[in-house]
Each structure stands twice: as structure tokens, then as C-alpha cells.
A protein has these predicted regions:
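Charged alpha-helical initiation segments
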Residues: 1-38
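Hydrophobic packing residues in well-ordered alpha-helices of helical domains and bundles
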Residues: 7, 14, 38-41, 97, ...
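Amphipathic, well-ordered alpha-helical segments in soluble domains
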Residues: 13-24, 44, 51, 143, ...
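N-terminal interaction modules that seed assembly of large macromolecular complexes
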Residues: 23, 29-63
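Long, charged low-complexity segments
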Residues: 62-149
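Short acidic DE-rich linear segments
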Residues: 155-160
């Protein structure tokens, strides 16, 4: 299995995760009437985003456009500084991508969270409140879906 075949598999996997997240919000939530499903959708969106960022970093490193580091946070910083714009992510999109990563981290670290009115409320260790709404998660899905499409068009078209 070559590099581009593996890339295609990761793009497809990312797309499936986004579809799962969207299905959770649009289909499962109205039936189950449980806003905690938004947190599950956020996890799917974060996994999809992380897969795409990893793929972009590997591809850009292979093309010798960037340098990779052993530190994951440094590599994510490289993505935002040198790669995101190349893949069609403007300042607002990059802000949303960072928010996905931030909220996902807060969700994982949170000792206390609850759902109310189709929103998930997360309390962090510093007693700050973070809210994820249905509308917000759909916005996240849209941004990551756009990144997925741009990766598909950029990385996989370069093969031909």
C-alpha cells in the first residue's frame, strides 16, 4: 500500500467520522432527546480533524515544505502557521479548528459537565464554563468537512 492509497483511506475515514457526527446531531439527538450526544459528536469531529492534520503534516513533510517535530503541540502549531492557509482555511476557519481542539481537550479533562436545552455545558478545573450547542457543532462539522474536501483535492489530486 503506497502513501497515496493510505492518504485516500484516511480521507475516507475522516469523512465517515464527520458523517457519524452529523448523524448523531441530526438523527439521534431529536429521537433520544439527550444533548450529551453533542459531546459524542464533538469527539468524532475532533478525531476527524486530528486525522486530517496528521495527514497534511505527513504530506507537507514528504514534499519538504515543513519540518516535523517530536512534540505534537509544535507540529499542530506548524500546521496552523504554514499549512492551514494552503488548504483553504482562512482566519475564521483556523479559529474554529482551534476551538474544536480546545473544547475537545476541555471535554476530556472535565470533571463535571451536564446537558441543558440542546447544549452541553463543560466546567473546567479553573471554574470556567464552556458551552457547545447544536448549531456550534454543525459549524464545526462544516469547517472540518471543507478541510476534508480541500485535502482530498490537494493531496490526492497531486498523485495524478
Amino acid at each position: 500500500m503506497g502513501f497515496y492509497d493510505k492518504c485516500a483511506g484516511e480521507v475516507i475515514e475522516s469523512y465517515k467520522m464527520l458523517n457519524d457526527a452529523e448523524r448523531i446531531v441530526k438523527v439521534a439527538m431529536p429521537v433520544a432527546k439527550d444533548a450529551k450526544l453533542i459531546a459524542r459528536a464533538l469527539e468524532k469531529v475532533h478525531k476527524s480533524l486530528f486525522l486530517l492534520i496528521s495527514l497534511i503534516l505527513k504530506y507537507e513533510h514528504m514534499r519538504k515544505r515543513i519540518r516535523l517535530y517530536k512534540n505534537k503541540d509544535k507540529n499542530v502549531e506548524v500546521f496552523y502557521e504554514k499549512c492551514a492557509l494552503r488548504y483553504g482555511m482562512d482566519a475564521e476557519d483556523r479559529k474554529m479548528l482551534k476551538e474544536i481542539m480546545f473544547l475537545s481537550l476541555k471535554h476530556k479533562e472535565s470533571g463535571f459537565e451536564f446537558s441543558k436545552d440542546n447544549r452541553v455545558v463543560i466546567f473546567d478545573d479553573n471554574y470556567k464554563i464552556h458551552v457547545i450547542s447544536e448549531k456550534g457543532i454543525m459549524g464545526f462539522i462544516g469547517v472540518v468537512r471543507r478541510l476534508n474536501l480541500n485535502v482530498k483535492n490537494g493531496v490526492l489530486r497531486a498523485k495524478n
